[in-house]
Swiss-Prot record:
Source organism: Dehalococcoides mccartyi (strain CBDB1)
MF (Gene Ontology): DNA binding; DNA ligase (NAD+) activity; metal ion binding
Record: active site: K114
SUPFAM superfamilies documented for this protein: BRCT domain, DNA ligase/mRNA capping enzyme, catalytic domain, Nucleic acid-binding proteins, RuvA domain 2-like
Role noted for this protein: DNA ligase that catalyzes the formation of phosphodiester linkages between 5'-phosphoryl and 3'-hydroxyl groups in double-stranded DNA using NAD as a coenzyme and as the energy source for the reaction. It is essential for DNA replication and repair of damaged DNA.
Protein name: DNA ligase
Gene name, Swiss-Prot/TrEMBL: ligA
GO terms for biological process, alphabetical: DNA repair; DNA replication
Amino acid sequence: MFSPLIEVENLRREINRHNQLYYVQDNPEISDAQYDTLIRRLKELEEAHPELVTPDSPTQKVGAEPLKAFGIVNHPYPLLSLANAFSDTELEAWYQRVKKLLGNISFQIDCEPKMDGLAVALTYRNGKFATGATRGDGFQGENITRNLRTIHSIPLNAEPNAPPVFEVRGEVYLSKNGFAKLNRERADKGLPLFANPRNAAAGSLRQLDPSVTAERPLDIFIYALGYSEDSLLPDSHWQILDYFSKIGFRINPLNRLVNTMEEAKEYYRQMAANRASLPYEADGVVFKVDSVSLQHRLGDVGREPRWAIAYKFPAEQVMTRLKKIGISVGRTGTLNPFAVLEPVNVGGVVVKQAALHNEDDILRKDIREGDTVIIQRAGEVIPEVVAPVLSKRNPESKPFRMEESLFNPNLNRPACPVCGGEIYRPAGEAMHYCTNVSCPAQFERQLEHFVSRGAMDIRGIGESLSVILAQQGLVKNVSDLYYLTTADLLQLPRMGEKSADNIIDAIADSKTRPLDRVIFGLGVRHVGNETATLLSRHYGNIWALAKTGLGELQTIPDIGDKIASSIVAYFSEEKNVAVIRRLEEAGVRLTSDQKPVNKNMPFSGMEFVVTGKLESFSREEAQEKIRSLGGTAKDNVTKATSYLVVGADAGSKLAKARSMGVKELSEREFINMLEQS
């Protein structure tokens, strides 16, 4: 059930809905921590499956577009987002990366509570507060100057010795007491209550009537200098904030300057322990390299500064009852266990299911049906079952066994829950499989995979239509798609003639997809898009691949025994060969126009990984340029990686590359390499 494509589409819908609630309506349904886990999981999936990345994905934005109800302010220097750490290990990795980039010199670290409010930029000209804007998308924000003028802790006039023009950045917030008072007043008036202080602060600042904002007990802490025309300011973030404190700006008194990472970790531990007693909401700690000149040396990567990181507080955990362990069927026949839970609210989201991965994972955690379990949403969109609460366990409960759970009394054996097919677990693998190649659940997932963006990219056929086409019997194997007619589609419920025509056109357009897309779309077990590209370049056409033997496959770099055996097994099945023949008869391109790699080409012997969003071309285009120059384009960072090309919103691959010492290339450096080649 939990295919990457389905999960990515569900995630984007969920994140976009929450963005609308959060940024536009100021009435979100989930906490910032829960939102972070959604974004983190989506980034992980897009890193693992780059063919699923789209320009409109929420991961491709810093924030949200400004509201048109307010004027637009262009930020002279972008308000960047921060990379996140969720453990001491990740924080230490950031510190070591920075040290290495700076040549192992010592540096001081600023430690600041990560306020859970609304980021704003305040510009002063000739001693007067001139403009105030929200973060917006990082490059443009909403002009909320009139509303910010009502906040008493924002000076309307700067001290005479202040720089002639400068911008400071701060977090507008509502204290816990102020939030409680505001909600009591709203309850008395019969108005809807705010979900949390952050929403209340954001909603207050986005009032079209400044008098409404003036009634709210808003406050601000300044956390950074955006820019200044005074070149005599100190080369220390700490001293700059101290300077602005002395000329009338409010700085958080809990900020600390430390000399070592151990001191920084201790600061975090103290803040986490005292989190509940803080007068405002905070969701972590921000660490910054103190020296401004060192900050400039370190620069940014994507849309995140290298010199700062946000160490988030732990995710919320709750207890609920695990009613049942269900089993879903994947496209290759994998039998995937998942927890069916008593509905429980975790960080503002009602959770009914959680991932369990496989039988070994369930037994390792000793999770049983009927248990009271601890659930958390940290790094997993599908929430995770952390552990059972043994003190609440029914003494008669039994350990979970996949084959016992799948036992079908009518067949007197374990069976696939969808088709009743026999199941097996290959030696050395963690997953059980349904052996029935005609299992309808498998084919539904296979069809979803074939039409997906990374494969044949047939627009208009998504998850739901794939299921309908399979269940209605219109498509019994993937080649049937190319024999559909508009009349066939018009038989389906809620299908109009224009939509049907568009789908038929999209199917026809897909016939010219490159060979590697076809190979990937066929869904051969263990053959991902990287392997499909290797096979396409090596064999040049599908029939040469179909006729190959195990020995030849094993001579191809990165094709191991498991992949080779899977390929041979796939093409030894006559039904698979018959599908490919029908694809060929329908006009699907089954040959490659790629040229063999010349060892004297500029990128020969180099292995590249591309991460994040590039401005000049898509990730797929960048990978094709690498291949055209003889290089290898991979999806995952390993010790063999020569270069990591880093775009905006880079994810976990960047952290992994830094931990392994892989050389990073900015987009401009990558383009320079292309031009010089």
